[in-house]
């Protein structure tokens, strides 16, 4: 099997977090305790343990699991936001991640300003975003709200804007974390139609959902996470 057909390879991924046994309200309090020589005791928490899978170009992987199962953590490892404690992730292509609703946005900026801010996070040039701006605005259906600070947006409006920016060009790998679980049903269907076009063009998708029916409709593979 040649690498040209592989989009993503996840090998023995585990990630450990340290949770404080004591209540520490903020970073300042933590530093003071350390300066005073007070020991902070931690519990180890494994968010993911020994995750393995491989995706071919064009695969659509649905990731299912209850809250706290490690779905979002897995996507953050794949996107490079978190470094795994053990294991490796091999990516073959440009990734467009939509991991947290509004991540990469500045709430005090308008929707228009955030097009350029979030677009730059995704690696798009300002010139490219100016060229694609009307297309982004049209798909988002935000209209005059594009000039309103996004701290005044509903979660559905932020999802519209984020999805419209992230999918303005087809990436090789698209990561979606429950983005299609917010907003109105009409816009979700519109997003699904755009995703279907990407599927037809061979884009690889990792898609977190609580809906088994949605995963069955959109994905050709699925994994179920239970406590990592």
Predicted regions and their residues:
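Conserved ABC ATPase "signature" region
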Residues: 28-36, 116, 128-145
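The feature captures the beta-strand-to-loop junction immediately N-terminal to the Walker
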Residues: 64-66
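Conserved ABC ATPase "signature" C-loop
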Residues: 227-228
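Pre-NBD coupling/linker segments of ABC/ABC-like ATPases
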Residues: 2-49
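Conserved H-loop
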Residues: 211-217
């Amino acid at each position: 099997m040649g690498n040209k057909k592989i989009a993503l390879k996840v090998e023995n991924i585990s990630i450990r977090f340290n949770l404080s046994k004591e209540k520490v309200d903020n970073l300042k309090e933590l530093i003071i305790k350390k300066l005073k020589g007070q020991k902070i005791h931690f519990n180890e928490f494994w968010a993911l343990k020994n995750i393995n899978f491989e995706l071919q170009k064009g695969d659509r992987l649905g990731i299912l699991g209850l809250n706290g199962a490690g779905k979002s953590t897995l996507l953050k490892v794949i996107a490079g936001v978190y470094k795994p404690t053990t294991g490796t992730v091999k990516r073959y292509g440009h990734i467009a991640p939509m991991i947290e609703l509004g991540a990469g946005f500045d709430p005090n900026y308008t929707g228009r300003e955030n097009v350029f801010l979030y677009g730059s996070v995704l690696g798009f040039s300002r010139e490219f975003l100016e060229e694609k701006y009307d297309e982004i605005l049209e798909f988002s259906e935000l209209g005059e709200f594009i000039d309103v600070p996004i701290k005044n947006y509903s979660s559905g409006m932020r999802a519209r804007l984020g999805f419209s920016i992230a999918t303005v060009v087809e990436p090789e790998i698209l990561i979606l974390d429950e983005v299609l679980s917010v907003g109105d049903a009409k816009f979700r269907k519109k997003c699904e139609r755009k995703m279907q076009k990407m599927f037809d063009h061979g884009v690889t998708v990792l898609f977190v959902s609580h809906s088994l029916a949605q995963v069955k409709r959109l994905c050709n593979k699925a994994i179920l996470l239970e406590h990592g």
